[in-house]
Amino acid sequence: MGVRISQIADELGYTSQEVVAKAQEMGYKRIKTGSNSVSDEEASAIYDYIQTGVLPKKTEKKQTAKKSVKKDTVKKDTVKKTAVKKDDSKAAKKTKPIAKKSAPKTEKKVEKKVESKISKPDNEILEAKPEISKPEIKAEPKKEEIEQKQEAEPKIEVMPEKKSKIKSAFARGETLASESLKKRRGLVIVKKKKDLQTTETQKIEAPKTQKINLGLDAIFSNADANLKKKEKKKEKKQVQSKKVDTTKIDLTSDRELADIRIDDDEDMVVLPDLTLKPIQVEQKTKTKDQPNIYKVSQNKVYGNDGSIARGARKKHKKAVKNSDNEIIKSIEIPKEIRLYEFAEKIKKQPSEIISKLFALGLMTTKNDFLDEDAIEILGAEFDIDIKIVDENAKLNYVKVYDEQNLDDKNAVERVPVITIMGHVDHGKTSLLDYIRNSRIARGEAGGITQHVGAYMVEKNGRKITFIDTPGHEAFTSMRARGAEVTDIVIIVVAADDGVKPQTKEAINHAKAAKVPIIIAINKMDKPTANPDMVKSGLAELDIIPVEWGGKYEFVEISAKTGKGIEDLLEIVLLQADLLELKASLNVPAKATIIESSLQKGRGPVATIIVQNGTLRVGDTVVAGVAYGKVRVINDDKGKKLKDIKPGECGVIVGLSEVPEAGETLISVTSDKEAREYAKKIYEHNRQKELSKSTKVTIDELSAKIAEGEIKSLPVIVKADVVGSLEAVKSSLEKLRNDEVRVDIIHSGVGGITQNDVGLASASENCIILGFNIRPTGEVKELAKERGVNIKTYNVIYNLIDDVKAVLGGLMSPIISEIEIGQAEIRQVINVPKIGQIAGCMVTDGSIQRGAKIRVIREGVIKFEGNVSSLKRFKDDVKEVAKGFECGVGIEGYNDMQVGDFIESFKEKEEIASL
């Protein structure tokens, strides 16, 4: 390969152009850019020339004419080097203040150590570690450079041997990498044994004895000094045979201790033991018999010297049994309580409660939450009258809001909220498109609605809010949310298709929400339209039209031509007038989150419908675990609004995280209040989730064990909005049987991130499913590198079909048998060294070589195996048809009898499907 000019430039700290100029001076005219490469020999020659300024012997003759130019460049280089060194000195001052402070103190010692090492050439001498690993140009150093170097680094004398070693290393042709490694290593000085013992021991030794003063000064100021003096008494008795030469080492200096070589005992540098354990032990033993002065003296201002404290009396702990003996007859228990908390309340041991529940067939731990039934049963078991109190009412900010805003005196008429529901492809979105003069249906993937949408329409000077819900079976929870928020439900039924499963489900949702229902019979423009079929089908569900004596309005419409839509809107407004929908304007806002998502550049975004009050920009809100200040409000067309009044819809930005769809959003007075609500709800939900994972009944235990044997497909699900994520998750959880299931290890709203890829790579055979999102190029590259499969979809049933196919591959294949033929054994021949050969007559189909056979005797299967040989007379054949005789040898079976039947068959494997 060779070495690029740019690599040499990086190593030396020069630009590529400067190195190219130097190379051309040396005679390498082919080198013109930094991307050109040279051989290792040429690279070392260029490196030496830039460092020393001396041309190699080969090129020296050619370059005599360019000496003046070279001098100028060398001067420039030296100027640049001084600038680099100045920067180095500044960096050294900033990054190593500790080393700088300690340098002047240890200067003399270091010089002595270096001089002592000159006499011992065998020892290892290493270079000082520079701040930047850029090699210097070997030019004449100026005074300014020397001064800068002295300021930046501690003054350490470098011996002439070192310079000669460096030059010889370059002469030997060391590589650039090895040279830079040497320069990165720090200064290591191995201490030769020297008579410094007297100076060290003089410093360490202290006066022999001194009486301990028992005043405050002895306790606070001189305690450590006295203890050290006492310690030295004991140390005198011990004879130090080894480790006499102890040398202080500045541990704070920037040195690599791994580079210090300890070859023998002579050159060993002994580190002082800095631990305080022996001092602490001695202190305990010495001060054990002394009176406790500190306790008495700490509260006195004067006269603390001669006082002696009385020994404190031992406090006898109260027996715990006394509290257990208390008989509790009645108690209030919170609705959500853990087992150990319940045990504390009724003065029982947790183990006692666990055993009671185990006897009742419920396996629990002390951290599990107890439900109301379990609490009542335990109350009966322990003969305690238990009253269950809902302490979580404090977390119910909606209830607090409703109690504070009961005054309806200032209520005004509000905008009606209409939800359009029905079966998939019956024309719900097309109807809304005609009303709004828009083209939403064309924009939806697959022509089906997969999001909940809220839209404002004005009719006869009055506003109407419409909610469009998906009709696909996967979006049940979306339809349920739409029915809960709405005032009136329009159920769309196709005149040519009649009542379908989702039609029935929509009617049930509307009845559960106790809201008026209007039936819109769509697609009346089709020739196959049959409205009577629709009416009779709905009559079976107790939805009887007004003309048949019922109470439900039926309107025949066409979303394509617009027929009957005006009549439908008139009926909607009439129904709204009958309901007398009212709300207060001048109270804090209360709204319902219809849909939420995470948008790039905007953060968490929520589509809401205000039910009471007025939501304004700048209001502080809380919605479940999400909270924040409303920064932006947009309508369904993207236009910015200042506020949203009751019954109106809008999109808000500013929440801390993506809220759950269906959550109630409340406007609160302060950010602190919102944060506290969100934090408490989050902690409560988390604890309940953790409790769920540990609870299991004895009946469920066997199912859990069996689940361990089930093959699972781990998936990570990411979607554009919360509603779609719910739908995908619920659909995937339904895809299971006794053999396989889907294991959702992570799900979330937003794009596929690198963290998702990392999590998928950590799980075996995990795939990432994206709904209405696309991964970025970086994420795709990382997924390809780690072998993670990412699949994205726009239509939910395509996603479900693909996952079904993958699960089918995990299932054991379905093996089916194909009968080929049957033969009757007429004669059995024993052949030496081979075994039995059956002389057969083929009675049905054919006998084939390679096929499986089974031997049947009197209707009972005696053996299953393979055909080892098949002959007709003396010839080997592949197949013998019906009506012909043949000889059959069966592999591994020698118990054939005349009258047995040989049945030939093949096994066919088919991929199982859910």
Curated annotation (Swiss-Prot):
Entry coiled-coil feature ranges: none
Annotated PROSITE patterns: G_TR_2, IF2
Region annotation (G5) ranges: 558-560
Start-end of Basic and acidic residues biased regions: 70-91, 104-160
Superkingdom field: Bacteria
SUPFAM superfamilies per UniProt: Initiation factor IF2/eIF5b, domain 3 (SSF52156), P-loop containing nucleoside triphosphate hydrolases (SSF52540), Translation proteins (SSF50447)
Pfam families recorded: EF-G_D2 (PF22042), GTP_EFTU (PF00009), GTP_EFTU_D2 (PF03144), IF-2 (PF11987), IF2_N (PF04760)
Region annotation (G4) ranges: 522-525
Segments of this protein annotated with the region Disordered: 58-160
Record carries keyword Metal-binding: no
UniProt main location, coarse: cytoplasm
Basic residues: compositionally biased ranges: 92-103
Family: Belongs to the TRAFAC class translation factor GTPase superfamily. Classic translation factor GTPase family. IF-2 subfamily.
The name this protein goes by in its record: Translation initiation factor IF-2
